[in-house]
Structures are given as C-alpha cells and as structure tokens.
Amino acid sequence: MRTSQYILATLKETPSDAEIVSHQLMLRAGMIRRVASGLYTWLPTGLRVLRKVENIVREEMNKANAIEMLMPVIQPADLWEESGRWDEFGPELMRFTDRHNRTFALGPTHEEVITDFVRKEISSYKQLPISLYQIQTKVRDERRPRFGVMRAREFTMKDAYSFHLSDECLDATYQVMHKAYCNIFERLNLDYRPVIADTGSIGGSVSHEFHVLAESGEDAIAFSDGSDYAANIEKAEALAPSEPRPAATKELKAFPTPDAKTINELKKHYGVKPHRGVKTLIVYAAPDENGVRGLVALVLRGDHDLNELKAEKHPLVDSPLEMATEADIVAAIGAKPGSLGPVGLSMPIIVDRSANILADFVAGANKDDEHYSGINWDRDVTDYEVADIRNIVEGDASPCGQGTLQIKRGIEVGHIFQLGTKYSQAMKAGVLNESGKNQIMTMGCYGIGVSRIVAAAIEQNNDQYGIIWPQPIAPFDLAIVPMNMHKSHRIPDIATNLYQGLKDAGLDVLFDDRKERPGVMFNDMELIGVPFTLVIGERNLDENKVELKNRRTGEKLMIDIDTAIDAIKAAVKG
C-alpha cells in the first residue's frame, strides 16, 4: 500500500476528550474517528488491525470444531420475553418499535436467538454436541460510553454457544474452549491471565474471564506467585487466617470518640490501628415470607473492604446488596453510622473470617460519639455467623494452598460460561435422548471482545512515540521510508523494486511515497506502530545497503540490497 493512495489520517495533537492511552493513540494513529458518543468509524489502519484479530479468533474457533454462522443484530422482543431477560436486562438493552408496532432490541448478546435456532434445527441426541459461533456487531446502550472502543455503545464481538446432553459433555467442550482462548491470546502476543469469575447476569455455574494486564484496567485480578491460580478480586476467596484467636486480656470499656466517624479518624485522633478495630456495615436482609426486609450487620476488620458479591450471596442478605438508610439504622440501633459495632445488636450479625480472630478489639458502641475497646468474641458478642465477605489483599495466602496472592489491573477481553439449562429450560430447547424421551439441552457460552482486544493491545504495547504492535496484529509488517525520494534519481527505483519484491514475498508493506520531510514520515510510522521500518537513504546506497529498524527494540540492521528481500522477510517473520 502506498501512502499516496491511502488514508493515513494521523494527528499531531492528542484530542482533549481522550482519557486513556489506547483512545488517544487510536485517534492520533488514524485508526478510528468518533461519530457520536460511544460510536466510531473504523478507518483503514484500524480496520486492518481489527481484521487480523478476527482472523486469529476465527482460526482458533475453527480448530476447536466450532461452526461459524451469522445472526441478526435486530432481535424480536418475544424471544427475550420467553427467556425472562426482557425485563431483567435493564436500560442497556436498546429497544425500538417498527412501523408495524412490533417490538425489537439491538442485540448485546445472542443467547435467545441461538437457542431458538437450535431448538428448531436440532432434534436428536445424535446431532450433539455442537458448537456454533459468529463474529458480529453488538449494541449496548452504555450509560456513560468512555475510553474509545474500550467501552463503546457498538462493538465487535465473537460469541460462541455449545449445546450438550450432559454436564460432563459440556465440561469437556468448556475445557476445549478454554484452551482455544489461551491459544488466541498467546498468538496475539499479549500478557494475559484466565481468572475464575462470577457468572453475572448471563447466568450459569462455572465461569472464567480472560484479562489483558494493563494499569488502565477496570478490574482488579488476584493471582498466586506459586501456582497458576487467578481470580477476579470479586471472586477470590479470602482464606481464614491460620493463626488461632488470642485469649482475651482486656475488659470491655466505653470511651468517647466525638472526632471519629471513620476508621482513619479513629486512628488519627485516638491511635487505634485499623487492623485492631472493626467496622460494622448495616444492609437490608433477604425478605421474609411476608416480603418484609429486616437489617443485617456485616462486620469486617478496619483495614479490609467489603466484597458486595460475596455478601449478597449469603442467604441472610438481600440481593442485590443494598446499604440501609441512616434513618432505618437510627430507628433500629439508636446510633448513626460511624458509631456502630457488634456489641448488643438485636439483628443477625455476619463476621468476616479475618475479623473473627481478633481479640481485645475496638468498635463503635452503638451510641453516637462513643466506641468500645477490649471487645472479645463469644464473651461480648455471642450470636453471630462467620463468612468470607471481604476483598482479598495483596499478600493473602492463595486459596489453592500454593504461594501468596498478587493483585494487578486487568482489561476483560473474554468471558466463558457453563450456562447449564438457564436458557434452554426457559425456551424449552430439548432433543430426543437415547431413550426416545425429550431432554432439555445444557449450554455453554463463550465471548471475546474483538474490538476491545485492539484497544487492550495498545494499552499493553506503547511508548512515548506511539503504538508498538505485536507482530501478528500490526496493520502492516513493514514500512518503507525512502528519504527525500522526490529529490533523488536512484532512490525511487530501488524503493519501488524493494516494495514490489517484499509484497511478492508475502509481507504487508506500507510504502511512504509522500512528499514529506523524513522526520514527519518517521514520526507517523512510529505512531501507527509498524513493527519494522526500512530506511532508504543516499548515504547507505553508496555502500549498496539499506537500514532495517525494529520498532520495539530500536535495533538497526544494515542489509545488503542484493539480499534484502530474504533478509528482511527473515527478520520480520523471525
């Protein structure tokens, strides 16, 4: 491709509304342009990268014996009503009515459509298992689209679905898909982690997320330094401390704390170390048989944070978890938040495992501006349950029993689920089994954010000059920069011959034939992240050589023109 016949569309300045590196560089490198909030046009350079990611995903899906198909973006409301998700999904589901007053949605996912297709086309156990996938545009009406294509309203996704007669068969396919995802991210040359995850609104029992590690990641992931264990911080289990609870040595004693409404203020004004105190959070209880919600107290060590997902899965706690209002707290306890504690509470108490091994600790006295010191479990508080309700912290023991946990930020780019029968049961998707009886199929679901991978790769591969693409998804393998070509008699012919020869050798080449200063050309090639640049200049031609520069390492290699094609191909593909 010659730049004179191409839309390079690079920008010198960083757009002011671009918050993260990938958004900034995708705009500056001429990969995307904003059409409206959360909506982007993919320019030629960006589309080349997107297509290369798609091709790798497609190849690995095909190797996993998944069959490609294509389903419509527009989906009828009755399928979503049948599955029960029409009301569950919320405002992110973009809905509309056509001229015939029929209601539709723009699909953020395709569980309903694929289940409807399979129940109509698959009738016998002999046709199972089967895995189907598509690479398709998805639409999600994000409340606050941001970070460019990282959180857009329209995006490209690969979604696959598998159908089985047994959980054992589902698990076997799930493992195949897990391996296929690992193969994809390894081929993309990305630093990633598969992590144990919560199933969320999709449903199901077993789930893994795939995260590309990056400081800008929205998710915190925990992984062991002694094994391959990794989990989303929301899912990672905080083990009970191995040390026993010390014996009580102090008596319960109240003391005034007019200046302390938080753990940090308790430390600042009264010298209480956060790990020697507890905080008490009041949430609404699961409704009783009459639909009435009471209150539940959640008690954690002062330096730990509540894990809402863990807490709301406790049978005593309402889901989704909701913090009690100050008015309800005062009515039930007689004190405001900031002075609450477990002593004397007349409501269910759930104590985190780490808080349960404390002795002689400090907590609110359930009286405004007052705390207790010398609190001890089973003496001052006797009726409580113990559960894991906190986020893990770096240095915690790994749940697998090997090593300690580290925490890094990650960008979720893939998510796989063992759905079970959530959708097939609701939509009556069954087949005749070996006994000739109708049996509901069990399902798996496997998603990859294709357009999100493009942004995530940039977050992990950039420097002060621009993008540093992993070779497999670079828009071009090589850029040719002929210095002052339009002022030279010999450079045009040599550059053109090398361009044609390298294309014939199977390389994706960008030939910068613009009438621009060399500095502008070099800056653009570094900005768009071409892995190798072939520099052709008069001085090197005097020695019958050209210069090959590696974008990632900065290494420069002098190559003889007579053997340039083979040498360059070996370096680029090496």
Swiss-Prot record:
It is an enzyme of class 6 (ligase). It holds the Pfam family HGTP_anticodon. InterPro entries: aa-tRNA-synt_IIb, aa-tRNA-synth_II, aa-tRNA-synth_II/BPL/LPL, Anticodon-bd, Anticodon-bd_dom_sf, Pro-tRNA-ligase_IIa, Pro-tRNA-synth_IIa_bac-type, Pro-tRNA-Synthase_IIa_type1. It is found in: Cytoplasm. It catalyses: tRNA(Pro) + L-proline + ATP = L-prolyl-tRNA(Pro) + AMP + diphosphate. GO terms for molecular function: aminoacyl-tRNA deacylase activity; ATP binding; proline-tRNA ligase activity. Its EC number is 6.1.1.15. Keywords: Aminoacyl-tRNA synthetase, ATP-binding, Cytoplasm, Ligase, Nucleotide-binding, Protein biosynthesis. CDD domains: ProRS-INS (cd04334), ProRS_anticodon_short (cd00861), ProRS_core_prok (cd00779). One of its GO terms (biological process) is prolyl-tRNA aminoacylation. GO terms for cellular component: cytosol. It comes from the Bacteria. Belongs to the class-II aminoacyl-tRNA synthetase family. ProS type 1 subfamily. PANTHER family: MITOCHONDRIAL RIBOSOME PROTEIN L39/PROLYL-TRNA LIGASE FAMILY MEMBER, PROLINE--TRNA LIGASE. Consists of three domains: the N-terminal catalytic domain, the editing domain and the C-terminal anticodon-binding domain. Catalyzes the attachment of proline to tRNA(Pro) in a two-step reaction: proline is first activated by ATP to form Pro-AMP and then transferred to the acceptor end of tRNA(Pro). As ProRS can inadvertently accommodate and process non-cognate amino acids such as alanine and cysteine, to avoid such errors it has two additional distinct editing activities against alanine. One activity is designated as 'pretransfer' editing and involves the tRNA(Pro)-independent hydrolysis of activated Ala-AMP. Homodimer. This is Proline--tRNA ligase.
